[in-house]
Amino acid sequence: MIINAKGPASFAEKYIVRSIWENKFPPGSILPAERELSELIGVTRTTLREVLQRLARDGWLKIQHGKPTRVNNFWETSGLNILETIADLNPEGFPVLVDQLLSARTNVSAIYFRGALRNSPDTAVEVLAQIHQLEDTAESFAEYDYLLHHTLAFSSGNPLYVLILNGFKGLYSRVGRYYFSSSEARQLALNFYKELEVLAKAKNYVDVPALMRTYGINSGKMWLQLRDDMPTSIALQEANS
């Protein structure tokens, strides 16, 4: 098992998570005793204890006082916060993960974009006004796109959408910079922003779902043209930190 890590705690965390991912510690199984596991990984028991607590908070493990630590089925117990970890574990499957991520975001964003234009159209107009000074660079578009989604999610009337977006942030920022490196993708997005601005100024939230659906289809087609050339390094947290 080859693991790149910045320190003992990072190494221990990646060792345990990869062992769970590769079914060496399958769901429902009991982890080796703390002393045995610390010797196996090569870290102190104090470091291991901190790592186990962190993994339990993320849903990988179940720790109960006086009982051995049990491995969870992370698909049932973890949240969006492990997306980055899954990308790290399976870079070959990263394009499919991104497909699923973008599909989920498109479906959810149609709800909070409509809610934002209904509940707070002035906020939408204000954030959309920034498109007229937007630099034509991948970084600027990626940052603005996230800002737009975050602002509209917060003003939609349901702040839970913001928490969902936060779970996407790390991966989406990296993928966004790659996606918006295409001038065609930037132009497609800019046209969408302008159409959304027209709706916001007219306080027309009714037509938002249709606009979102059209943009989702067109941006999805654009993504399919770009995904096969995406560098695998985008999947790795260490390479992008």
From Swiss-Prot:
Q: List the disulfide bonds.
A: none
Q: Which GO terms describe its molecular function?
A: DNA binding; DNA-binding transcription factor activity; fatty-acyl-CoA binding
| GO biological process terms on file | fatty acid metabolic process; regulation of fatty acid metabolic process
Q: Where is the HTH gntR-type domain?
A: 6-74
Broad class of the protein's primary localization: cytoplasm
Gene Ontology CC: cytoplasm
Q: What NCBIfam families does this protein's entry cite? A: fadR_gamma, PRK04984.1
- Return the PANTHER family for the record: FATTY ACID METABOLISM REGULATOR PROTEIN, TRANSCRIPTIONAL REGULATOR, GNTR FAMILY
Under the subunit heading, UniProt states: Homodimer.
State what this protein does.
Answer: Multifunctional regulator of fatty acid metabolism.
Protein name listed in UniProt: Fatty acid metabolism regulator protein
Per the UniProt record, the source organism is Shewanella sp. (strain MR-7)
Gene name on record? fadR
